[in-house]
Regions:
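Positively charged, small/polar-rich N-terminal and surface patches that mediate targeting and assembly
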Residues: 1-92
Length: 92
């Protein structure tokens, strides 16, 4: 699962494409608050929104994606992107 500020959409998608990510499910326009990037609630007080990408992949691909996200985080600093690795029991 990758959560990121919608303002960096093109950078995120470019990096993930170059990293070999082809398949995902995107949930646009979600609200949240991070410890370093602040609140994004889509209103006048806390503008901005986040997007979520769900990615189901094998372990080697996961490691590559995590590496790409870490490199992007170094470049963007506090713009707001996090990746979470969750165990996937089964895909039908």
């Amino acid at each position: 699962m990758i959560i990121y500020n919608e303002a960096i959409e093109s950078e995120v998608m470019d990096v993930l494409k170059n990293c070999g990510l082809e398949n995902f499910t995107k949930i646009p326009g979600v609200f949240g608050k991070g410890s370093s990037s602040g609140a994004h609630f889509g209103n006048d007080i806390w503008p901005g929104r986040n997007n979520i990408l769900f990615v189901a992949c094998e372990e080697e691909k996961c490691k590559k994606i995590i590496f790409c996200i870490r490199e992007l985080r170094k470049k963007l600093k506090k713009e707001g992107i996090k990746a979470f690795v969750l165990n996937l029991e089964e895909v039908t």
